[in-house]
Amino acid sequence: MADETSADINNPALQPNGEDTSPAIGLISQYVKDLSFENPNAPAVYQWQGAPQVDVQFNIAADSVGDNLYEVLLKIDVTSKTDKGTSFVIELKYAGLFGVRNVPDDQLQPFFLAEAPRILFPFARRVVADAVQDGGFPALLLEPIDFHGLFMQQVQAAQGEQVGDGAPVGQA
């Protein structure tokens, strides 16, 4: 046993080099960057009958904000309308600040467009629900979003476009 341990201690390949070279990504902070709630037809809207039509749109962006620091922004726009008019409009920009170390560039985009939004979404969802409820409406719970599935669809669509660009059109 003692011989095995001393052999490991003397092996230069197993000695620490003082650097941490393993890939790491960490959430440093998350925050509401911008929040807007509009209730354009108050107080009449509270007397309207019928279920509103709710339209939800979202977008994801990632920007470098410093050395090994990236801000991932989840933008959610919700519009609720009835046949009498707009009930409410909410616009939320919810962001997360991520520290990145030793991650290959080809792995950053999948993280920023699939995994980071998945991490941020439950918190953004709560902000939307609270804002809608604070505006005098029943809390709006957004359905979960499969960010990974959406990212894979975008990748496949982009690959399809690249393949389609080189393919001949028509019959020869």
Swiss-Prot record:
GO process annotations (BP): protein folding; protein tetramerization; protein transport
InterPro entries recorded: SecB (IPR003708), SecB-like_sf (IPR035958)
GO cellular component: cytoplasm
Main location: cytoplasm
GO molecular function: unfolded protein binding
Membrane-crossing segments per the record: none
Protein keywords: Chaperone, Cytoplasm, Protein transport, Translocation, Transport
Pfam families referenced in this protein's UniProt entry, alphabetically: SecB (PF02556)
Compartments in which it is found: Cytoplasm
Residue ranges with Polar residues bias: 7-20
Disordered, as annotated region: 1-22
Family (UniProt): Belongs to the SecB family.
The protein's role, per its UniProt record: One of the proteins required for the normal export of preproteins out of the cell cytoplasm. It is a molecular chaperone that binds to a subset of precursor proteins, maintaining them in a translocation-competent state. It also specifically binds to its receptor SecA.
Complex and partners: Homotetramer, a dimer of dimers. One homotetramer interacts with 1 SecA dimer.
Identification of the protein by name: Protein-export protein SecB
Lineage of producing organism: Bacteria, Pseudomonadati, Pseudomonadota, Alphaproteobacteria, Sphingomonadales
